């Protein structure tokens, strides 16, 4: 804690270190742009949340990184890093009184901050299907098909998470079984649900032979369409067991417990116990699953990002409208 408090309250932020770290980040960005799957992830965020921070890569762009001066970085640190904008979470073999005393000793004189205003996500006026193409000469086409989801405070969050588990999480998921095991279209195929402070998304991803991109997109949409009709009690039960088992397994790690406590306190001003979360996961019904599937897995609202040897959006817009 002594080292961490010194880093937070008294960072050196030298010009030399500033320039060196900028070079490191520029190399990280170059690596991301060179990885088609990572680039597809970047493009789908831009497609879901265009022209706003939520849709931009957290690493920035080459131009934005180069433009950051040492003084602007120091100003950002002074505004954002302070007790009003921080949570100190401690997990492990330590008495509560000792943790409080150490925190007061090391952070008691931490100067006040003036955190930047938070701006809510603005969804586009038109929620019609959108397609973004990243033209690359690749041996494999990478596609991400997404739709807006629910936020981390939405009571349907657990329904959406379990829907995602049934759809594309793990080797027994629908997408894995249909697209890899049955049809042999893809090696890497999965879906994931994201829940942020005021928005969310559900995204399906796969990498396929460029000549099979049309077939893949048709099969993928068929799977998304079926789940609101035939999601089963057995699938839900398996997804609930998977989710609760994974939660308890993760919390065997002390660092994960620390993140569990700190993250909830910082974002929600409350900390749910694991038991409370498990109860909420187990309370989800098959009706809840089908309901969120009908509402959010609607082809009228699909967003598609593709990285591969393509230029025209037209053929893919037609496939989304089919």
List the predicted regions and their residue ranges.
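A domain-level signal for the structural core that forms small-molecule/cofactor-binding pockets
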Residues: 145
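A conserved active-site cap/scaffold subdomain adjacent to cofactor or substrate pockets
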Residues: 157-171, 175
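Flexible, small-/acidic-enriched active-site or ligand-binding loops
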Residues: 129-130
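Charge-rich, well-structured scaffold segments of protease-associated domains
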Residues: 1-116, 122-124, 133-134, 138, ...
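Short amphipathic alpha-helix segments
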Residues: 174-182
């Amino acid at each position: 804690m002594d080292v961490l408090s010194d880093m937070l309250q008294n960072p050196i932020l030298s010009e030399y270190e500033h320039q060196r770290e900028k070079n490191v980040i520029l190399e990280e960005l170059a690596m991301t742009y060179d990885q088609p799957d990572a680039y597809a992830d970047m493009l789908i965020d831009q497609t879901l949340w265009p022209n706003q921070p939520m849709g931009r890569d957290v690493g920035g762009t080459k131009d934005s990184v180069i433009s950051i001066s040492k003084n602007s970085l120091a100003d950002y640190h002074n505004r954002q890093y302070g007790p009003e904008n921080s949570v100190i979470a401690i997990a492990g073999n330590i008495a509560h009184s000792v943790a409080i005393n150490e925190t007061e000793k090391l952070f008691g004189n931490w100067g006040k901050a003036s955190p930047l205003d938070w701006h809510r996500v603005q969804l586009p006026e038109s929620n019609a299907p959108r397609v973004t193409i990243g033209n690359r000469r690749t041996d494999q086409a990478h596609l991400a098909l997404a739709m807006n989801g629910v936020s981390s405070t939405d009571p349907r969050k657990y329904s959406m998470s379990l829907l995602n588990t049934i759809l594309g999480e793990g080797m027994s998921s629908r997408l894995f079984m249909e697209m890899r095991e049955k049809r042999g279209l893809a090696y890497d195929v999965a879906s994931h649900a994201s829940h942020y402070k005021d928005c969310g998304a559900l995204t399906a991803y796969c990498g396929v032979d460029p000549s099979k991109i049309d077939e893949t997109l048709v099969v993928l949409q068929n799977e998304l369409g079926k789940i609101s009709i035939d999601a089963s009690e057995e699938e839900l039960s398996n997804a609930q067991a998977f989710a609760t088992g994974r939660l308890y397994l993760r919390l065997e790690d002390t660092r994960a417990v620390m993140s569990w406590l700190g993250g909830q306190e910082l974002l929600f001003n409350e900390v749910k116990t694991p038991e409370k979360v498990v109860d909420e996961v187990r309370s989800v019904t098959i009706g809840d699953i089908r309901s969120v599937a009908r509402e959010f897995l609607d082809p009228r609202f699909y967003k598609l990002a593709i990285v591969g040897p393509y230029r025209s959006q037209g053929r893919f817009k037609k496939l989304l409208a089919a």
